[in-house]
Amino acid sequence: MKISKIIIYDEPTVPEIQINRIEKFLKDTFHTDVEVRRSFFENVNDEIFQKVASTRIFELKKPFSKHIPTELEIQIERKNTDNSQNEEKVLYDGFELQKTISKFIPTDEQNQNVLHIILTNKLTCTFDESDFRYHARALIGTNPSIISTTGIIEAPAKPKEYYLELMTDFSKEKTDEINKKYKGEFLEYNDPRLSEVLEGYILQAIMYYETGEAFCENKECRLYNAHWQKELLYSQLKNKKFCSKHEESFRKIINQS
């Protein structure tokens, strides 16, 4: 295993994250040094808020273009740091955000043996040139890796029937009724299942760092790249296993520790 230490940054505005359980899970799985830190965006100066605000997305159908953030945008960054949900639905270019965060990682920790995993409520997106638009992403896999709790909820799609029923009436009453009807079939904000699902994304981040491959196309694998909430809940909560290929890969990684 190339990694000698994993530093995971909590997102305290999302109380469903059982950070101590995640720490134990990582230690039991990889037998490596694991350190938990508070939110990466907590107790930071305005320079970080300004840099992060500059990674915001304004045009969903155009590649990323940097801009100079306004004071209002910087204030929104401060506000979102205190809220469990990305209430303003601000979108961030995931790769630009990753580059920004990497500049504020302590110099003595910027080496190939220390993997930083940032948990955040910020909604990360990447531009897809196949359809020329941005898509929400739960994981930006590199070092530091970013795992978006909002992305886990928003990126994998809800059942098709959910959207079809919602199209007939967008009122709050109808939305609440539909959400109640399909409750349990997808992750919601303040969902107690979120922490366990997070473990799977952390495994994907580690796999990407170790092998350059984060996802699997096999639905029976915990590394499966789920496009639907149903698939996500199955791979991370019901199945919770690796396919034979990735089971072997993880054993090799662990044996190299």
What are these regions (language model features)?
Residues M1-R137, F250-S257:
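N-terminal low-structure segments adjacent to metalloprotease catalytic domains
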Residues I6-T13, H135-R193, E210-S257:
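Metalloprotease/metallohydrolase-associated module, dominated by Zn2+-dependent proteases
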Residues V197-Y209:
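Catalytic glutamate of the conserved HExxH
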